[in-house]
Amino acid sequence: MDATLDLIASDGFEGVTIAAAAQGAGVTRQTVYSNFGSREELVSQAIAGLAVEVLGGIHSRSNATDTTCEYVVELIVAGRAAVRAHPVLATLLQAERGNPVFDTGMMSRAKPVARELLEPLVERDPGVKSSLDDIVEIALRLALSVVLFDDDAVHTDDDLRRFLTRWLSPAMPSSS
């Protein structure tokens, strides 16, 4: 996966091939195919792994929140900050061929990652369990929108927090 991330950083998504990833990792193409099945899956898993690693660092920030809404808001704010700060994640902002954000099936690959990041909500408030799928769906769609369509109205973290809180608060389950 590191070889794939190196290729994305140096050549963009178009530079990622099974052969190039195998060469960079020092393994055979068959090994890469056996582990990932396709170029798209290789890229998606590499980006998802990096996203989980980068966003994993925000749990202390999210754990300091009091409500489900605040947790989701902080996760989205931190996610946008990570995309802005990390060179490989920043490539997600470019509408280039091979970008996994624009691949068919992207949502089905992104939902398990989002679910993993939002699963701590159930531990904090078991009443959230019945709504978790909906929370994953709305948080993922909002996060993608925030990352892809930056705007002056929500450019700063505080502006984004206010916007997200205003619209997410009525939609989130009450904490018990």
Labelled PLM ranges:
Residues 55, 99-137:
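Amphipathic alpha-helical packing segments from all-alpha helical-bundle domains
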Residues 2-10, 24, 41-61, 74-78, ...:
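Alpha-helical structural segments
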Residues 81-85, 120, 137-156, 167-175:
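Amphipathic C-terminal alpha-helical segment
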Residues 13-20:
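Ser/Thr-centered, proline-biased regulatory motifs
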Residues 9-13, 30-43:
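HTH DNA-binding helix-turn interface
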Residues 78-108:
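Amphipathic alpha-helical segments used for helix-helix packing
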Residues 2, 66-84, 133, 137, ...:
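Amphipathic alpha-helical segments that line or abut small-molecule/effector binding pockets
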Residues 20-23, 32:
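Append "Primarily bacterial transcriptional regulators
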